[in-house]
C-alpha cells in the first residue's frame, strides 16, 4: 500500500507538536511490533489522541490505520487526508463494512488503531468498552496492545474550549 500522504502529514504534525511545545513521554513503544498486524486499543480523552498515538508508533517504523467515524471522512479537509492515509471509515449505523475492511488490513500486516470507548470520555475515565477490538483480534489472529494517552485533554477535548496556545503540556502515551 503506497503511503504518499502519511509522510508529509507526519512532518506537519511534528511541526505542530513543536509549535505547541509539547513534552512527550512515550513508554512501552517496544511493545509495538515492527511487522505483522496488531491492534492498538486506545483510551479516548481528546481530539488529538489519534495523532499522538500515531506519533508513538513511528519509532517502530509503522503507520497506524485508525478507525474513525464516517463524519470525519465526510469533512472537506479531513476526509481526503483520512482516505489518503488509509484510515478506515466507520458508519456507526452499519459497521459491518468497516469491520471487514479492518480485518483485511490486519491480515495484510497493518496496525489498526481503535478507540473501544467509541467516543471521547468527558469524565477522562475509561468508559465501557465495545467488543470490536477483541472480535477483530480474534478474527485476524493478531495481538491487542492496550494503549493509554494522558494529557491531550489539556489541549482539545469535548465540552472544553480548545486552547492551542498552551505551552509545555506534558503528554504521556
Predicted regions mapped to residue ranges:
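Helix-to-loop junction immediately C-terminal to a conserved catalytic motif
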Residues: 5-7, 12-44
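Short, basic, glycine/proline-bearing loop/turn elements
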Residues: 13-14, 83-89, 116-120
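Catalytic core of membrane glycerolipid acyltransferases/transacylases, capturing the structured
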Residues: 33-94
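Hydrophobic/aromatic ligand-binding patch that stacks against planar heteroaromatic rings
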Residues: 56, 81, 104, 135-139
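Catalytic-site beta-strand/loop segments enriched in glycine and acidic/polar residues
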Residues: 105-134
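A cross-family acyltransferase "interaction/gating" segment
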Residues: 124-173
Amino acid at each position: 500500500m503506497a503511503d504518499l500522504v502519511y509522510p508529509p502529514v507526519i512532518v506537519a504534525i511534528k511541526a505542530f507538536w513543536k509549535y505547541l511545545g509539547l513534552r512527550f513521554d512515550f513508554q512501552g513503544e517496544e511493545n509495538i511490533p515492527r511487522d505483522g498486524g496488531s491492534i492498538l486499543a486506545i483510551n479516548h480523552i481528546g481530539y488529538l489522541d489519534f495523532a499522538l498515538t500515531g506519533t508513538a508508533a513511528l519509532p517502530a517504523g509503522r503507520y497506524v490505520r485508525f478507525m474513525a467515524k464516517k463524519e470525519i471522512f465526510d469533512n472537506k479537509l479531513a476526509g481526503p487526508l483520512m482516505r489518503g492515509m488509509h484510515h478506515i471509515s466507520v458508519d456507526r449505523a452499519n459497521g459491518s463494512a468497516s469491520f471487514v475492511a479492518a480485518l483485511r488490513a490486519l491480515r495484510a500486516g497493518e496496525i489498526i488503531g481503535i478507540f473501544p470507548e467509541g467516543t471521547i470520555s468527558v469524565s477522562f475515565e475509561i468508559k465501557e468498552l465495545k467488543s470490536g477490538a477483541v472480535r477483530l483480534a480474534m478474527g485476524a489472529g493478531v495481538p491487542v496492545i492496550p494503549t493509554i494517552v494522558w494529557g491531550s485533554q489539556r489541549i482539545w477535548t469535548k465540552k472544553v474550549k480548545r486552547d492551542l496556545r498552551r505551552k509545555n503540556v506534558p503528554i504521556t502515551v
